[in-house]
Amino acid sequence: MIKLFKNYAKIDTANTTLLLASGQGKVFKVYYGKKIKDDTSYLPIIDHDFFELFSSTDDTYYSNMFMSCNGEGNNIENMVRIINEDSTFVSRFKFVDFQIVDVNKPFNEFPHTLNKEETLEITYIDEITNVTLKQYISVFKNSDVLSSYLKVENTSNQNINIQRLLSLQLDFEASEAIMYTLDGAWCRERNINKHHVKNTICMIESRSGFSSNLHNPFVIFEIENEGYFSSNLVYSGNHKELIESTFSYWNRFN
């Protein structure tokens, strides 16, 4: 179930809660973990202005952004990369609104999940280029699964080149993360590998046009004091999954 109140969006599955907040034109992940109550009395505790974005030379700066793009002001792997017609590659997507929408209607262009119970639509717009970005998070009945994807609408009067458009971004605070991957080769696929990620980036990808037996898109992340999280794709194609761990004990999964 999805609930909207004040500048928050609360996304509940059977046993988990994802709590998002908007502020300063951004959307931030406030909480993701075991299911929490609908009591809103705790919200003033976390209802504050978020940090301004500084330059990439400030290694101590970081924030729990739910969507990021080139030009955010930090040195972390981002979710969206768009090249504009004039060859510039900085985007300034600003949050517009939260809406609960119906996305169970036919969606024939791409593979997609079915029987969604509710879907949150997060809309952003780049006021310089006038490009619109929409982020969708869906929940399912009696399940802890979240479905997520991004959609770019070229509402500008110029051509754009989409370099990167990842499906999900989650930030966690921990001194170290562990990434479990399923790697291999033909007839020897899905071997379990465990990667300790600290002050570095761990990434798998396929550029062959299909998911491939080299790196399965299903990955598991173990985050200190948070537990285990996993992700997978609903299609076979090129993919990339990565987790970046910083010196400041922040971890970003894309």
Language model region names:
Residues M1-L4:
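Basic/polar N-terminal segments that are highly enriched at the extreme N-terminus
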Residues N7-K10, T16-L18, V27-F253:
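Polysaccharide-binding surfaces and accessory modules of carbohydrate-active proteins
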Residues L20-S22:
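Intrinsically disordered, low-complexity N-terminal tails
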